[in-house]
Amino acid sequence: MRSGVIARKVGMTRVFTDAGEHVPVTVLQIDQCQVVAHRTTEKDGYVALQVGVGKAKVKNVSQAERGRFAVAKVEPKKKLAEFRVSEDALIPVGAEITADHFIPGQFVDVTGTTTGKGFAGGMKRWNFGGLRATHGVSISHRSIGSTGGRQDPGKTFKNKKMPGHLGVERVTTQNLKVVRTDPERGLILVEGAVPGVAGGWIQVRDSVKRKLPADVPLPGKFRENGSAGASQVEAAPEAPASEENA
């Protein structure tokens, strides 16, 4: 089980296939997604990675968190998240996960906070049908109707679908296909819509309901100390020693 990443939703656009068909995609951008800490079975009871993105102002970071960032030798991060991983998928602390951590064609699950829409009625919030347009109905065409009956049950049950605040909920959309990646600009293009507003934080991880492709990088694709991850780069051959003329 590999780590996920935190990305920022840029917006939607479309890309064209070789057959000329257009595919609507959501553009997600990774902004220096670095591993901040490890969670181990011995110390924490589970195995996970804590990753962070964005650059936070030092004045907005608590003294305790400054110390943790200093130990990891990374700049203070604006957004943090934990991802459960297997022990063989731990990425070194301080490494930066890149966009080619995911490959085109694989499926991912994305998690975000939905757009807030304020107070909404039953028809918009729960897709109620409303009352009739005529035949004795006046004023209350979009009302939800009776909620509690008379003597039986004589009350409105808890969790009854009623008008109220709509949006600003944590939602996960599963099985979105990765159409394209751009490691140089840190972009991931996924097919379809992603919950949340443009500029919102999105968590992207491998799909839990789809089989992971055999050619995905393990434990992941990352840069360590300004270079690509050791697990993904072959050692460069040594240059032959030059002989000096006597």
From Swiss-Prot:
Chain positions covered by the region annotation Disordered: 140-162, 215-246
Record PTM N5-methylglutamine, positions in chain: Q151
Low complexity biased stretches: 234-246
Alphabetical GO biological process terms: translation
Gene Ontology molecular function terms on file: rRNA binding; structural constituent of ribosome
Similarity comment: family membership: Belongs to the universal ribosomal protein uL3 family.
Subunit structure, as described in the record: Part of the 50S ribosomal subunit. Forms a cluster with proteins L14 and L19.
Name assigned to this protein: Large ribosomal subunit protein uL3
Species whose genome carries this gene: Methylorubrum populi (strain ATCC BAA-705 / NCIMB 13946 / BJ001) (Methylobacterium populi)
